Each structure stands twice: as structure tokens, then as C-alpha cells.
Amino acid sequence: MTSVSSDSRKQFKGSGDHVFDFDNKENHDFLSLTIKQDNNNNNNNNTNVSLSPSIKSQATSSTGGNKNQIFSQMRELDKKSLMLIETYYRDKLITYQEKLKRELEQIYNKKLQSLKIQYDSDSYLKFKQFELETKKALLLLLKEFQDLKKSKQQQEKQLKLQQIKQESNNNNNNNNNNNNNNNNNNNNNNNNDDDQQKDIDNSNDIVNDFKTDKILKEKEEILNKLELITKSITDLFIQQVDISTDTIDFQSFLSNIVATTTTTTATISN
């Protein structure tokens, strides 16, 4: 006979929704109790059968061998009855197990669905939190990048200002140097001008000296010529030469006087 172990369950709900507590000695196992009752009924029936007139007459008239045969039949009948009872309650137990399995599956599915919803909700919240933290981190990185860019621009601006200042100083120094050079050049030019002026003055002096010498020479020549003319005129008057006969000579003489006078005048003018 297949029995339901008390270790595998604590309570059993019957068809009338009555709960049997297997740990309580006052209550008996539902299946065992029912099977026991059915066995008692079958035993009573068997007893009634064994007490039937035909069997009773056979028992009284037969020997011990017949009695053993009767008990063997009774045991076989009892065995078949137990098999029928076991089959019946095994089917009931299977039905109950299937029902319990369906209920457990429903509970499991509901719990699983609830856990899935909770997991989805938690996952969504975690995703949103991660997204928020990511955006926050990106904003921080962007701020750091902007600060770094601003700092770099300021450094470049300061460097550019320093370069401009340095270039300005260099230009000023160059201008000062150029001014100094220009002053030196001007001084040199002035010195050169002075030298040139001196040279010019010296040249002028030389020219003037040359002209003076030339004039003096020409003056001396003129004086000599005048002296010669005076002498010639004196000689003419002294000799009382006939002018009419010596007209040609006299004209030549006058031409020489005019030429000499013109040359002397031009020389004096220069």
C-alpha cells in the first residue's frame, strides 16, 4: 500500500475543506483513516461473506484445508479491496497535486511578474540615475574644458601682450639706436659739410688767388701796353709824321688800342 509520508506535508485539505493536522495525535491521516475505515468495512463484508450459509456449512463440514482456502480467498479479496482503495485515493491525490501545482504555478507566475515589474522599475530607475550621473559628469567635463580653454586663452593673451610689449621695447631701442645713428650720421654729415665747406673755401681761396694773380699779370700787361702806346703817341708827335700819309698805320694803331682796351675791360669784369 502506498502511503503519504508525514514528513512531506504538515496539513492535508480534504474535499470538505477540513484540514487534518498530521502532527496532532488526536487527528489521523485523512487517507490512512479513510483507508482504514474502508478496510474495516471490507473486513466486515468479508466476515459476512464468510459467515454466509454456504461457506459456514463448508467450514463445518470441511477439514482444516478448506479453512485455509477460505482464509486465502479472504486475503485475496482484502488485497484487491486495498488495491482499489489505493487506486481511488491515488487518483484523488494526483488530482490534488495537479490542482496544487496549478495554484503554485499561478502564485509563482504572479510573484515572478511582480518581481519582473519590480526589476524593470528598479532597472529603469537605475538607468535614469546612471543617465543623470552621466550627464552630470559630462557637464563637469564640459565646465573643466571651458575653464581650461579660458585659461589657455588668457595665457595666450598675456603672452601676446608680452610679445607686443617686447616688440615695442625693441622698436623703441631700435628707434633710439637709429636716432643715435642718425645723430652720428648728422654729426658726420655736418663734419663732412664742414670739411666740404672748408674745401670749397680753400678752393675759392685758390681760385681767388689765381684770379688775383691773373688780374695782376693782366694789369701789368695792360700797363705795359699803355706805356707802349703812350710812348708811341709821344714818338708820333715828336716826329710830326704826316697823318694823311700814314692813315693806314694810324688806323691799325687805333684798332690795336681798341682791342687792347676791350680785352682789358673784359678781364677786369671777370
From Swiss-Prot:
Residues 39-48, 168-191 have a biased composition (Low complexity). Residues 35-67, 168-204 are annotated as: Disordered. Residues 49-67 have a biased composition (Polar residues). This is Uncharacterized protein DDB_G0293860. It comes from Dictyostelium discoideum (Social amoeba).
